[in-house]
């Protein structure tokens, strides 16, 4: 039997365009997990994270694309790449007879949206940041729906068909997870989880390294996800301590956050969605070089829901960070109140909402 998507009885065919960082890839994976009966293929860029995360799950197609920042010559080269990539994606969409495209933004979204638009293939774009990216602002009007992680984003997208859904996280964040056996943390002992994001966070790691001795002396456990590129940073080393546990990366973040009293984290949209879903209060230290300072804006949205505080990455804020953590350790009732506010603010399962939207858009486009 022919299972191509143009047969109404066949499996729907979805092309996912998500590349680069965990903030783009993990939400798309979370949605894909909700569509087990769909035929899904992936569009990415060579030598990026999707090569490790996606290849064993879905067929992976790659086009050469880069960002728009840089010199006028680089921008001209990026435009040439965009033209070539759009033609490549157009051929892929035609040969694969895809029903619909899902993209989570970033520069890979541009050729995916333009190619789909030229063929009349519907597109669902998810924008997780408060300040939408350039591609979302430029091309969102070509998408059937722009799904938003935060309600505040809509004001930056006039004339776009936007719908607030939250940011998808993996299924394990919605159900209680067993705590990892390799971390012998006694019940009742306070746990701080430090998350630098999928690309690591040298400045955050160094701030934590400076302040952690005081927190350990106060009785806290620290599970520190340093990021692979940061693990050997000599300026981010904390003296060996039985309650300090550094790891470049762990797959059981859901279990860690469900057990944590609070977290110290970058403010990427994916990390914030995981914190919100698990109702984990957080001290947020945004990545200072994020495009258009979008992590700081993301952090303000999280803090506005009553879930923590935000501070800039700076040596001047070392005392503030040290004392804020000590205060939270000494006042667990305040932390519990923040957790309750986050629990009340958590949106429905965004992965399921987006999966349902994909089904609705496909069905309406097939009529």
Curated annotation (Swiss-Prot):
GO cellular component, one term: plasma membrane
EC number: 2.4.1.227
Pathway field: Cell wall biogenesis; peptidoglycan biosynthesis
Keywords, alphabetical: Cell cycle, Cell division, Cell inner membrane, Cell membrane, Cell shape, Cell wall biogenesis/degradation, Glycosyltransferase, Membrane, Peptidoglycan synthesis, Transferase
Gene3D superfamilies: Glycogen Phosphorylase B
GO molecular function, one term: UDP-N-acetyl-D-glucosamine:N-acetylmuramoyl-L-alanyl-D-glutamyl-meso-2,6-diaminopimelyl-D-alanyl-D-alanine-diphosphoundecaprenol 4-beta-N-acetylglucosaminlytransferase activity
Binding locations of UDP-N-acetyl-alpha-D-glucosamine: 21-23, 129, 170, 198, 295
Any one biological process term the GO annotation gives: peptidoglycan biosynthetic process
Chief place where the protein resides: membrane
Top-level taxon of origin: Bacteria
Topological relation to the membrane, as annotated: Peripheral membrane protein
Record localization: Cell inner membrane
Reaction equations catalysed: di-trans,octa-cis-undecaprenyl diphospho-N-acetyl-alpha-D-muramoyl-L-alanyl-D-glutamyl-meso-2,6-diaminopimeloyl-D-alanyl-D-alanine + UDP-N-acetyl-alpha-D-glucosamine = di-trans,octa-cis-undecaprenyl diphospho-[N-acetyl-alpha-D-glucosaminyl-(1->4)]-N-acetyl-alpha-D-muramoyl-L-alanyl-D-glutamyl-meso-2,6-diaminopimeloyl-D-alanyl-D-alanine + UDP + H(+)
Keyword Transmembrane helix recorded: no
Function: Cell wall formation. Catalyzes the transfer of a GlcNAc subunit on undecaprenyl-pyrophosphoryl-MurNAc-pentapeptide (lipid intermediate I) to form undecaprenyl-pyrophosphoryl-MurNAc-(pentapeptide)GlcNAc (lipid intermediate II).
PANTHER family (UniProt xref): GLYCOSYLTRANSFERASE, UDP-N-ACETYLGLUCOSAMINE--N-ACETYLMURAMYL-(PENTAPEPTIDE) PYROPHOSPHORYL-UNDECAPRENOL N-ACETYLGLUCOSAMINE TRANSFERASE 1
Sequence similarity: Belongs to the glycosyltransferase 28 family. MurG subfamily.
HAMAP family (alphabetical): MurG (MF_00033)
UniProt-recorded name of the protein: UDP-N-acetylglucosamine--N-acetylmuramyl-(pentapeptide) pyrophosphoryl-undecaprenol N-acetylglucosamine transferase
Source taxonomy: Bacteria, Bacillati, Cyanobacteriota, Cyanophyceae, Synechococcales
Name of the gene: murG
